[in-house]
Every structure is written in structure tokens, then in C-alpha cells.
């Protein structure tokens, strides 16, 4: 079994990507937080992944590259709640409440994204918050604040 120990780049940086045979390794958002991963690709080849502790996999990361072939990480869609607050005060209130539940979160300029949880959805409904439930491809995995570096 081949064990990958480094990230060679990202497929978005490859100009002539159509000239390569691409073998995909599909991972969940939770998988990419593990230190050691053993998984089969979409071509039923078993691989190990063991990166340095400070390295995190992202969608499109290349683990193998030669003149003809790429082995690429593909993150699966994650079931999330995308919260758009009407005011900064409302966002602070929501973030405070979800923080008390130890919910991992990601932020954009205008939105808070959290993993789907029916109790969180009920809280948002009860408080008439603007939100949508969607399945999206996260750029990186959810982490708790203590895990963030």
C-alpha cells in the first residue's frame, strides 16, 4: 500500500488538467482531521495518508503526480446550516448561543456556517433567524476553536 506523506499542490493550479488521468480519493470533512487515514480510491486502490501534524487536506489537493496521472483529494458534500444575520448584534447573539453548545463554525464576510444539527435548526426557527440548510463542499473541515491554529 502506498502511503502519502505530503501534499504536492492543488488541482486548481494545474493548467492542462485534462491531459492527466485523475484518480480521486473521496473524504468526508471529518476524515481530513484524522492524523492517519486508510482509504480506497474511486479506482479501488487502497492508500494510506499520513501528513505532518500541521498539514490539513483540502479539496483538490494532489497527493501523487507524474506525467500522466494525478491522485487527488475530493471532499464530500457536508450537510450544513448557513446563517445570515440581519444585524451584527443578531450575529453576536447567535454565535454566542452556538458557542455555548460547542458548535464548530466557519465564517464568511456575511454568514456563519455550522454542521447541521436539528436542535440548532430548532433554535434558529424559534428565534426567527435567517438560515438555509444546504449540502455544500467545505473548503476545509470544521474544527473546534481549540483545534484552530
Curated annotation (Swiss-Prot):
It holds the Pfam family UreE_N. The keyword DNA repair does not apply. NCBIfam families: PRK14112.1 (NF010710). GO terms for biological process: protein folding; protein-containing complex assembly; urea metabolic process. Belongs to the UreE family. Its main location: cytoplasm. It comes from Ureaplasma urealyticum (Ureaplasma urealyticum biotype 2). Coiled coil: none annotated. This is Urease accessory protein UreE. It comes from the Bacteria. The keyword Chaperone applies. GO terms for cellular component: cytoplasm. The gene is ureE. One of its GO terms (molecular function) is nickel cation binding. Involved in urease metallocenter assembly. Binds nickel. Probably functions as a nickel donor during metallocenter assembly. SMART domains: UreE_N. Keywords: Chaperone, Cytoplasm, Nickel, Nickel insertion. It is found in: Cytoplasm.
Amino acid at each position: 500500500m502506498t502511503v502519502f506523506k505530503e501534499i504536492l499542490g492543488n488541482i486548481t493550479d494545474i493548467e492542462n488538467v485534462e491531459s492527466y488521468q485523475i484518480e480521486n480519493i473521496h473524504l468526508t470533512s471529518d476524515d481530513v482531521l484524522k492524523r492517519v487515514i486508510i482509504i480506497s480510491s474511486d479506482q479501488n486502490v487502497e492508500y494510506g495518508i499520513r501528513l505532518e501534524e500541521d498539514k490539513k487536506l483540502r479539496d483538490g489537493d494532489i497527493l501523487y503526480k507524474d506525467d500522466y496521472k494525478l491522485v487527488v483529494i475530493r471532499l464530500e458534500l457536508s450537510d450544513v446550516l448557513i446563517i445570515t444575520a440581519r444585524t451584527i448584534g443578531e450575529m453576536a447573539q447567535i454565535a454566542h448561543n452556538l458557542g455555548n453548545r460547542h458548535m464548530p463554525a466557519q465564517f464568511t464576510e456575511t454568514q456563519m456556517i455550522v454542521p447541521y444539527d436539528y436542535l440548532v435548526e430548532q433554535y434558529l426557527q424559534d428565534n426567527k433567524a435567517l438560515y438555509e440548510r444546504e449540502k455544500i463542499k467545505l473548503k476545509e473541515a470544521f474544527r473546534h476553536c481549540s483545534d484552530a491554529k
